[in-house]
Design a protein with these regions (language model features):
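Sequence/fold signature of self-assembling virion shell proteins
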Residues: 1-4, 22-29, 128-224
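Alpha-helical scaffold segments that mediate packing/assembly in large oligomeric complexes
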Residues: 40-107, 220-224
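Extracellular fibronectin type III
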Residues: 297-311
Length: 313
């Protein structure tokens, strides 16, 4: 809560109050690593620098996994908005409406609001006369990596394939990442292993977590739409039940997905009946992805981040 303001009395001063600060619990729930053996004989027989290539690949893969996990939490914790089929004639209006909603929710308009747009959406933004290219905004904007600015948002192209997701708007103050522990990617000699001779391993590890601190500060826009997902306590300890609206096909779900559902792609997951299927072994902070399946392919998705009150104690 904000600090309270009171009238000041010159003779008696002002009564001191106490802070109403609330603290968020952040569970460190991701522990990822790479461990790839490179045989010395094989490495010597390859003309290019195999070791350097695998080190680069390991670093890229770990960073990519952390970014993917972060994006899943961001999308699941966001306020979902359904837009009509986006086109060059309504993209500007859609972005302005998001700007207005965020301002009404008292999200700071301090130049740090961002808009992550998929390549298809970015193509529409480029056709807007209201879009200002980064080259016209000065070094401060260029250094952020933004491609430009529109309606007060710094625009970043985001090559995401989540079904029907067009863009995510937000402010960096209201979503966070914690890097709890890391072992940088390196080449580990395995000579002392007692098993491998002349071999090494590309190893690295990251322990981290992500959390959305305020849902109204993050807006995930789907076009033509997303599933609406709500949760309630199940019948057994650790259980929850989901109610899904907006679907005409069959439903499947994945708990804490390593990657997100892609429109038109096949989907594994577990069969889900809205309001009936109980998902077991849930914990607060778990992300549930629900996919609508039509003709064996993903048509739309919805996400929810479970709260403790939605899980049977």
């Amino acid at each position: 809560t904000e600090v309270a303001v009171s009238d000041y009395d010159k003779a008696n001063g002002i009564t001191a109050g106490t802070g109403g600060t609330a603290y968020e619990t952040m569970t460190i729930d991701k522990d990822k690593g790479v461990n790839e053996i490179i045989d010395g004989y094989d490495a010597a027989g390859v003309p290019d620098n195999l070791v350097a290539d695998r080190l680069d690949s390991a670093g890229y893969s770990l960073a990519g996994q952390m970014d993917s996990d972060g994006a899943t939490v961001l999308i699941a914790g966001a306020t979902a908005l359904n837009a009509a089929q986006l086109g060059k004639d309504n993209i500007w209006e859609t972005i302005v409406d998001i700007r207005t909603a965020m301002s009404k929710a008292n999200i700071p308009n301090d130049g740090k609001r961002y808009l992550l747009v998929t390549p298809d959406t970015y193509a529409l933004v480029l056709k807007c006369p209201e879009f200002t290219h980064a080259s016209d905004l000065g070094d401060a904007v260029l250094q952020t990596g933004a491609l430009g600015k529109i309606a007060g948002f710094l625009v970043f192209e985001w090559n995401d394939t989540t079904a029907n997701l067009a863009m995510v708007a937000g402010h960096p103050r209201f979503a966070t990442r914690c890097k709890e522990f890391a072992v940088p990617v390196h080449l580990q000699d395995l000579s002392g292993s007692g098993r491998y001779i002349g071999a090494s391993a590309v190893q690295g590890r990251l322990v981290y977590a992500h959390k959305v601190l305020r849902s109204v500060a993050i807006r995930a826009v789907y076009s033509p739409g997303a599933l609406a997902v709500t949760a309630a306590q199940g019948a057994t300890a650790g259980g929850t039940k989901l109610t899904v609206t907006g679907a005409s096909g069959t439903l499947k779900y994945t708990k804490n997905p390593a990657s997100r559902a892609v429109f038109g792609a096949a989907y594994g997951g577990t069969a889900l009946t809205s309001g009936t299927t109980e998902i077991a072994d849930c914990a607060a902070g778990d992300v549930i992805e629900v996919a609508e399946i039509v003709s064996s392919k993903v048509k739309s998705v919805g996400y929810i981040t479970l709260k403790a009150s939605e899980i049977k104690a």
